[in-house]
Amino acid sequence: MAELPKYVLEPLRRGDRFYVRSKRLAKLRLLFLLLLGSCIFAPPMHSQIAQEETLGGPDSHETGQGPHGHLFGEWAGERSRLLERGVKFDFQYVSDSLWNIKSDKKERFASWNRFRWTVDVDFGELVGQRDLFFHATALWQGGGNLGAYLGLLTSPSGMSSMNTTRLDSWWLEKRWLDEKITARIGQFAGQDFYGAQHYAASFIFEPMGYALGNLFTDFESFDPPSTPAMEVRVVPLHNFYVKSMVEAEDRDPFAHNPTGLVPQFRGGPVSISEIGFTPGKKATTLRAFDTVESRKGYSGLYQFGASYNPGKFTTASGVSQSGDYLLYWMASQAIWRVDPKGAKGLDATFAYDWNPPDINRNNTMLTAGLRFNEPLPLPIHNTMSLGYVQNRLSQQFVPPGAPRWKPEHAIEFNALLDPLPMLLLQPVIQYYANVGAKTGRALVFGFRTKVEF
């Protein structure tokens, strides 16, 4: 049985069923890594691609920071001088402060806090090695997990997981032919780029504020405990892309690599692929998460993806078998604009995923949402978003004599406000029905705070 991780539902210890890689597979993987590495450092072709956003979900930047976008300022101009050389530093704090103001459990305040340090390097600007980039990010995070306390399938926070201080991800990225071909190798999470919600920064609860919540079932990696990975992306047509990655499976990543500094190969290779259609935008310019600048005009993103893990899994009947997979469909579209070339207006998003109900208890999820960009007549950036999540458990895993599971429903409304260039506030209210696929309701209120240092 494949379930969500221990910090979402319950402890998941299956060391005795880890998929064991053969020596032949290990040699092939090492050979592929060496070949890809040699391609990354091949002589560059000319391009003038600027640095762009490399963080996603709650850590992404809705707007550019600009000259007054940091609490500590420009370091006497040193930040700008480094950026001119292709080196960008980012230090931020994000917190979700949430209360269950009504539920079957006693009222509780839970605050999840995260400090993140990030460096991005454009070697074209730094040493003349064009189209070669480096990214690394580390964090400290900790606090209370309200979703685990309430027994929810849908986590109220897109950040909460485990208390940790660690290197999250790093990679080297090489681009050819004006980004028509891109290769990346390093340590990064599948859920940062596959099954990730394009409008994630506009929502708080996890399935819409980061990535689809049951991508964990076949052990697609997530941040911050990213695993070794490699990816290739190809853009054969103006509005169409194909990308695929292979990552190392790890069924208990926080325990096996607590610092993130020692690459771990604890299971088989998990493969993830996606095709995408990008009406209104060049596929080469599109990233996993949108920004205020990228949402201008009637742009959209339509995705179909699949992940496959060849490891050992246990079915609902207790039989061990090899292989598990997940399919997902996602759509994000600007449906109305005040100015056809502007960002003010209404966006819609929809996503659905499925994997075999005889292997996966958390086997299907549906999300849908609306976002109104700049609804308030204010000089600051603001949005209002309404989201819905339906979480279903496979009836094949209902314990004998227990009642059938019900679909858990979650609704969220939030407003995002940018009162200062370095400060973001996002008050939110959430309602949950059939908590934990059983009975019961919960009402959660709180806010997200983000500070750029």
Predicted segments with their positions:
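N-terminal periplasmic/intermembrane-space "pro-region" immediately following the signal or transit peptide
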Residues: 43-96, 100, 106, 127
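Short loop/turn motifs that connect adjacent beta-strands in outer-membrane beta-barrel proteins
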Residues: 73-89, 122-134, 177-180, 239, ...
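Surface-exposed coil loops of outer-membrane beta-barrel proteins
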Residues: 146-171, 178-271, 396
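Outer membrane beta-barrel transmembrane domains
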Residues: 255-261, 274-278, 305-321, 325, ...
